[in-house]
Curated annotation (Swiss-Prot):
Residues 64-256 form the B30.2/SPRY domain. The gene is Fsn. The keyword Hydrolase does not apply. This is F-box/SPRY domain-containing protein 1. Belongs to the FBXO45/Fsn family.
Length: 258
């Protein structure tokens, strides 16, 4: 950066920064946040006009018509969630992503199990996202993680997520943990653990530092589901069989402890 600009950069008023930054792309905004403390402070306000404008440009108006994004209260958090949402190019051919960008719809195709992965995978750090099932579960409704090598569609009604060594899942229908084609016990470890009810919020917690996968239901931590995960890139993934069922996923960022 020019020496003169470096000298005066911290003194640029917020209203001028807002005007300048409103013309920039996201990558440019990230670079600007590294220029000086003043610019970093301004961009750390996740609800300012710059992030609101970016959010309005990228997200469909449909995304704001429900309470789906209420779990990510700031504009920047909503924008981040959008970039982590379901990937329309990495899902079963029987699935489409609705205009809101966060909800998948499974078409009523007989004898098929269909899934979808998120746009961004994780190999480092701690990550949490919320999944909400709308509509009947059918015989298979699995939520979890998968690598890019895991199948995303198969013939028949089958617990596809957890069917091989590239995916790990929790079947909400029978509370079984699934991996490598095997059931790994009932989850959570409770006597007569309650079954999932449509509309309940499932929070998936992937800890790439401790190599574990855990779940919460309605903000109650259910315990660690899987340990000793391999050092691979994992994507938020679901698998469903019921026609016209809809599944929403909202990325939350690092989980809050406690």
């Amino acid at each position: 950066m020019d020496d003169d600009l470096t000298e005066y950069a911290p003194d640029i008023p917020d209203n001028v920064l807002e005007l300048i930054f409103s013309y920039l792309k996201l990558q440019d905004l990230r670079n600007c946040s590294l220029v000086c403390k003043s610019w970093n402070r301004f961009l750390n306000d996740e609800n300012n006009e710059v992030w609101r404008a970016q959010c309005m440009q990228k997200l469909s108006p449909d995304a704001f018509k429900t309470d789906l994004l209420s779990v990510v209260p700031t504009y920047k958090a909503k924008l981040r969630a959008f970039f982590h949402a379901w990937n329309p190019y990495d899902c079963s051919r029987h699935v489409y992503i609705k205009p809101n960008g966060f909800t998948l719809h499974r078409n009523p195709v007989a004898q098929s199990t269909d899934g979808s992965r998120g746009k961004i995978g994780f190999q480092h750090g701690r990550h949490a996202w919320e999944v909400r099932w709308e509509g009947p579960l059918g015989t298979v409704a699995v939520v979890g993680i998968a690598t890019k090598d895991a199948a995303i569609q198969c013939h028949g009604y089958y617990a596809l997520l957890g069917a091989d060594d590239q995916s790990w899942g929790w079947n909400l229908v029978d509370n079984l943990l699934l991996h490598n084609g095997d059931a790994h016990g009932i989850y959570p470890l409770l006597n007569n653990a309650p079954k999932y009810k449509v509309g309940e919020r499932i929070r998936v917690i992937l800890d790439c530092d401790d190599n574990t996968l855990s779940f919460e239901k309605n903000y109650e931590f259910l315990g660690v589901a899987f340990t000793d995960l391999p050092d691979k890139v994992f994507y938020p993934t679901v698998a469903a069989v019921y026609g016209n069922t809809e599944i929403s996923m909202v990325y939350l960022g690092p989980p809050l402890d406690g």
